[in-house]
Curated annotation (Swiss-Prot):
The keyword Transcription regulation does not apply. This is Mitochondrial distribution and morphology protein 10. GO terms for biological process: establishment of mitochondrion localization; intermembrane phospholipid transfer; mitochondrial genome maintenance; mitochondrial outer membrane translocase complex assembly; mitochondrion-endoplasmic reticulum membrane tethering; phospholipid transport; protein insertion into mitochondrial outer membrane. Lacks alpha-helical transmembrane segments, suggesting that it resides in the membrane via beta-sheet conformations similar to those predicted for other outer membrane proteins and porin. One of its GO terms (cellular component) is SAM complex. It is a multi-pass membrane protein. InterPro entries: Mdm10. Its main location: mitochondrion. The lineage of its organism: Eukaryota, Fungi, Dikarya, Ascomycota, Taphrinomycotina.
Length: 370
């Protein structure tokens, strides 16, 4: 389940019209959400509040095996007042699972003015962990309709290594998206890129008027990085095929990534029936060692009809609970149940290794937002 702070950052990007699906780092986002969901650690409770249209705060307490906590604050000059009634109204807003790929968006010069956004939409985030005094911070800003720049900082006071800063610069034109990354700890430089191959067909007015958009969309991308201090390098190639809005059957996403250095190939297939169920499969294969693994995941949604707060009339169905499960040929099994109970979001999960004599891992997470 998406945390409250992640939800605020996601809404910031959404309201500033930034397409997160056009990034190479999110190429396999849907499969990762279904197959690699997080199991709560021990028992944790989180309280969050959107105190104004621009400011949010939260605190978290965790127990078992050790007692710790954190305090966080988020500020943005983007108006978030419409989130007040959505935060606890629908589990769908915090749902991390099948996310279909958005249509590539064409940015233009007066985009911020037309959407009544600030000239430089900005977000500030800070979190302090107790008692470790570990600090996290994020500064994000839209330099232009085509550019997003953000800095992530980590400070470990008890660690002698010192601070670690990650600078990320993203440039999105719709047809392609480039991402440049620099990390200070290892002086690592990285470049990512993603190209939409049938972009012209999807966005040319003449083609849109004369024929329907293609039911299939192709994307190709790459990633490469090099650590100046660590002398380590890496690279990967990837492709994505997904259904378009006029696809007559269930939506799907097919991806394939290759790491040529270690010879690792990963392919995923995800599909869903909206607001009912979702399925994902991942197959890993190494061309050097011939090792392979198959992983399957499923989601089952339960929805109920909500009543409009203003007219008391029935509205569209909203997600009230979600059951997720995964299994793999290596014997890993994970199960998670997420539900909304009034203003509380509840997550219960467990995971086990069937081929080893290991104890079950179990966790419970409560979150209250207002």
């Amino acid at each position: 389940m998406m945390s409250f702070n992640d939800y605020i950052f996601y809404e910031y990007l959404k309201k500033t019209n930034w397409n997160i699906h056009n990034l190479y780092c999110n190429l396999t986002q849907t499969a990762d959400n279904i197959l690699n969901f997080e199991i709560p650690s021990g028992v944790s409770c989180q309280l969050s509040s959107l105190t104004s249209s621009n400011f949010a705060s939260g605190c978290k307490i965790s127990a078992m095996p050790i007692l710790n906590g954190s305090m966080s604050y988020v500020y943005t000059n983007v108006n978030l007042e419409n989130l007040n009634r959505n935060i606890t109204y629908n589990l769908q807003h915090f749902y991390e699972g099948y996310k279909h790929v958005d249509v590539p968006f064409v940015h233009y010069v007066n985009e911020f003015q037309d959407k009544k956004l600030p000239l430089r939409p900005t977000l500030l985030y800070g979190r302090m962990h107790l008692p470790s005094q570990h600090l996290d911070a994020i500064f994000a800003t839209r330099l232009s309709p085509w550019l997003l720049f953000f800095i992530q900082g980590v400070n470990e006071i008890e660690d002698g290594v010192g601070d670690n800063l990650c600078f990320n610069w993203q440039y999105d034109t719709g047809k392609r998206c480039l991402e440049f990354v620099y990390e200070s700890s290892g002086a690592m430089l990285g470049v990512r890129g993603l190209w939409n191959l049938n972009y012209r067909e999807l966005n040319t007015k003449i083609n849109m008027e004369n024929k329907a958009p293609s039911n299939m969309r192709w994307s190709l991308g790459f990633e490469t990085y090099y650590g100046v201090l660590t002398k380590c390098a890496g690279a990967s190639l990837g492709m994505r095929l997904h259904s378009g809005p006029s696809h007559p059957y269930a939506p799907f996403i097919l991806t394939c990534t290759l790491n040529p250095i270690v010879g690792h190939i990963t392919s995923t297939f995800s599909t869903a029936e909206p607001r009912t169920k979702a399925f994902s499969a991942q197959y890993d294969f190494n061309i050097y060692s011939y090792e392979s693994q198959l992983k399957l995941g499923i989601e089952l949604w339960r929805s109920k009809q909500e009543m409009s707060q203003s007219t008391n009339d029935p509205t569209a169905n909203s997600m009230s609970s979600l059951l997720k499960g995964t299994c793999s040929t290596s014997g890993d099994v994970s199960i998670s149940w997420q539900a909304r109970i009034r203003n509380f979001l509840l997550t219960i999960g467990t995971e086990a290794q069937l081929t080893k004599i290991d104890p079950l891992f179990f966790g419970v997470h409560f979150e209250y937002s207002k």
